[in-house]
């Protein structure tokens, strides 16, 4: 959707006779009943620890999180504000401490916000999730094993799994006129690319 909007803006700039009813002014939208939607976790993998050793990074996390080492068995976040981390061959449970999130702020209470503010920005110096080459995103539909694989391969240094955003959180954000942070939700069912094509060329 964001990409379609950007393309539309580019087309407007290239068209000196823009009217507002051209095909590039529109994009596909679809509605599903909330009861038939499933929101899956959207996870993060990071290429480096910003100069820290694994031990130093774990120690730095303790300021804002209760840290428990789980070991080799895959750990899935159990509730809101609980995260799974895979680092140096082991899984950890990270539970955000009180004061790291704002229950009265529909954006500030999101786990993606907590992780971005307290870990990615504060410790790893990743300021912009959209442009940083040091971070990548893995849809939960691919499983936690994919996070472990990418770290064990040496491609990434650490992985974080998040508890899925609830439908209530999503609706609260929409109702207050806010915008979800990038890479927050993975919806199922997901429309397949190319099934429906909207041509920008007039008359097609």
Model regions and ranges:
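Surface-exposed, charge/polar-rich loops and edge strands
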Residues: 1-204
